[in-house]
């Protein structure tokens, strides 16, 4: 092929062939895989119920910590396309409820650590609205054990919502993104909005209580309390010279140096 034609034909054929393979091959396969994943997720929640919700709610905080929760977006979109709402998001949102309950317990267990308490006060409103990263990185993860007990709270909340899914009362969200209290306007289900809101609110309450109880009673060892339940504010140091030492010091300062 002449060089002048090669410059035009080769790139054109490359783009054309790769585009056709992507559109009619890879996209078709990806669509079938996404549909299968969505169907499996729906089957898992309808049959596994409380057990599936327990596992999903319990392991979601580590996914958020690593940023891997973004990989679930295709599953959410597939479920919304198939059913009109995703039943996965309300269960995963229970992890944030466990985190909020754990943070409240930390606040009470560390009354002398004003630094952590200030962080909790500033991050708690965001946590209630479903933004858990400030509480994760600022409170529970640095302490260690409260992060685990927060996962326990999320597991119980997820199990509660998953149980109702197994009983046929699906709780879903019509969009993805928010969680916590911010998810209430987006809730939808197969038994009416009132039932859906009641189940979701009950799951949040279970997550709050379970996260609080687990953290308050099992989230701190004696060594952890001894290390963190102290004031973090610097203590001003004052040097005062009193008594005979000060007097002798003053006298020696006035004496001339010997020759």
Question: What name fits each language-model region?
Answer:
Residues 134-259:
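Transmembrane alpha-helical segments and their short flanking loops
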Residues 73-155:
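Helix-loop-helix junctions within the multi-pass membrane cores of secondary transporters/permeases
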Residues 22, 57-69, 80-83, 126-129, ...:
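Transmembrane alpha-helix interface/packing and boundary motifs in multi-pass membrane proteins
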């Amino acid at each position: 092929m002449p060089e002048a034609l090669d410059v035009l034909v080769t790139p054109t054929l490359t783009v054309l062939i790769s585009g056709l393979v992507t559109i009619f091959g890879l996209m078709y396969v990806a669509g079938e895989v996404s549909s299968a994943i969505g169907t499996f997720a729906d089957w898992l929640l309808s049959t596994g119920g409380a057990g599936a919700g327990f596992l999903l709610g319990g392991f979601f905080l580590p996914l958020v910590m690593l940023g891997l929760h973004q990989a679930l977006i295709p599953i959410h979109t597939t479920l919304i396309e198939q059913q009109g709402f995703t039943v996965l998001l309300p269960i995963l949102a229970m992890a944030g409820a466990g985190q909020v309950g754990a943070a409240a317990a930390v606040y009470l267990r560390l009354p002398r650590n004003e630094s952590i308490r200030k962080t909790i006060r500033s991050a708690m409103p965001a946590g209630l609205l479903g933004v858990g990263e400030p509480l994760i990185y600022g409170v529970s993860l640095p302490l260690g054990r409260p992060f685990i007990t927060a996962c326990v709270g999320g597991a119980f909340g997820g199990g509660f919502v998953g149980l109702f899914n197994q009983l046929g009362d699906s709780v879903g969200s019509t969009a993805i993104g928010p969680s916590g209290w911010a998810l209430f306007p987006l809730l939808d289900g197969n038994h009416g909005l009132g039932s859906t809101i009641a189940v979701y609110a009950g799951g949040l309450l279970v997550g709050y209580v379970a996260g609080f109880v687990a953290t308050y009673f099992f989230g701190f060892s004696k060594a952890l309390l001894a290390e963190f339940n102290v004031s973090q504010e610097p203590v001003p140091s004052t040097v005062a010279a009193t008594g005979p030492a000060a007097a002798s010091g003053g006298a020696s300062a006035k004496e001339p140096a010997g020759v």
